Amino acid sequence: MAKPGRTPAKGAGTSARILHDGLVIASHGRHCLVETPTGERLICHPRGKKSQAVVGDRVRWQASEDEGTIEEVVPRRNLFYRQDEIRTKSFAANLDHVLILIAAEPEFSEHQLARALIAAEAERITPIIALNKSDLAEPFERAWNKLAPYRRMHHGVLPLSLKASGEADYASLMKLLAGKSTLVLGPSGAGKSTLINLLVPGATALTGEISQALNSGKHTTTSTTWYWVDEARTTSLIDSPGFQEFGLNHIAPMQLAGLMPDIAEHANDCKFYNCTHLHEPGCGVIANVDAPGKPGPISATRYRIYGELFAELSQSRY
C-alpha cells in the first residue's frame, strides 16, 4: 500500500481538464487524503468554500503539481451525521454497516445506542450491535438482558471477548463484515481500538502516517479514517473515535416513530392519523408500553427515549 502523501498519484501534473476517480480515506479541515484506484494517495482540496467531502466519498479530482482539487462528489448512497452544541456535521458516507461496539463494563448508555440506531435506520444502513467482555460473567449477563428489547427488534447482538478470544472473534466479525464498508463506533472503554487493531494490524502506525500527510499533528478525537482490512481492498473499516451524539436534526419529529422498529410496529394502530404517541387517547403505542401489572412489547426505557428525542427534535426547529 502506498505511503500517504509520499508518492504523487498518476495524473499529477497532467492536463487540468482530466478528472480522476478517487476515494476519500481521511480528512482534516479542508484537506482530504484521496486514494486512487491503484492505491496511490495524495492531498486534495474541495472546490469552493461550501463544498465538503467526507470519508467514504467517491470523488472526481483534478490534478495540479503535487496535490489535487475535488471537482465532484459522486452521489452518495447514504450519509452519517454527528452533532455538538453548535452544529450538525456529516462525517462518513457510502456505508454498508454500522458496527456499534459496547461493553459489559463500563455500563453503556442506552440513549446513545438508540441515537446511533436511529441514525443508521434513517439512512437505511444495516446496524450491528457487538457486546464486548463476555468473559465478565455477571456484568455481561446484566448487559445482555438490558439488550433484550434490541434482540426482539431483530438487531443481531454479537457477543465478543476481544482480549480473551481474539482469534474466534476475528472469524465471527469477518463473517459479517467481509466485502462491506463498516463504520465502527463505540464509547471509551468498550474495546474499539482492540477491535480495529485485531482486524487491521498496524492501524496505529497507519493513523500516524495519515495524520502526518494531512499535517494534522497528533491523531485527534474528531478525525475519521478509512482502513482496508484485506490486500484486495474489498473489506473496509471506518474508525470515528469517540461515541459522539449522532446528528438527528435532519429528522422531523413525526418521522421518529418510523425509525424505531418497536414503536413503528404499533404506530398504525392509533385512533388518530397524526398521533404523536405521547398523550393521545386511543394510541396504539402507549397501549403497548411495558408497565407494572401490564406487560407490553415496548420497553418503558425505549418509550422514554422516544419522548426525549421527540422533544429534542421539536425544539431544534424553532
Swiss-Prot record:
* InterPro entries named in the record: G_CP_dom, NA-bd_OB-fold, P-loop_NTPase, Ribosome_biogen_GTPase_RsgA, RsgA_GTPase_dom, RsgA_N
Q: What class of enzyme is it?
A: hydrolase
Please give the Gene3D superfamilies that the UniProt record associates with this protein.
Nucleic acid-binding proteins, P-loop containing nucleotide triphosphate hydrolases, Probable gtpase engc, domain 3
Does the entry annotate any disulfide bonds, and if so which pairs?
A: none
Can you tell me which residues bind Zn(2+)? 270, 275, 277, 283
The entry's function note states: One of several proteins that assist in the late maturation steps of the functional core of the 30S ribosomal subunit. Helps release RbfA from mature subunits. May play a role in the assembly of ribosomal proteins into the subunit. Circularly permuted GTPase that catalyzes slow GTP hydrolysis, GTPase activity is stimulated by the 30S ribosomal subunit.
Q: How does it assemble?
A: Monomer. Associates with 30S ribosomal subunit, binds 16S rRNA.
User: Under which name does UniProt file this protein?
Assistant: Small ribosomal subunit biogenesis GTPase RsgA
Q: Which organism is it from?
A: Variovorax paradoxus (strain S110)
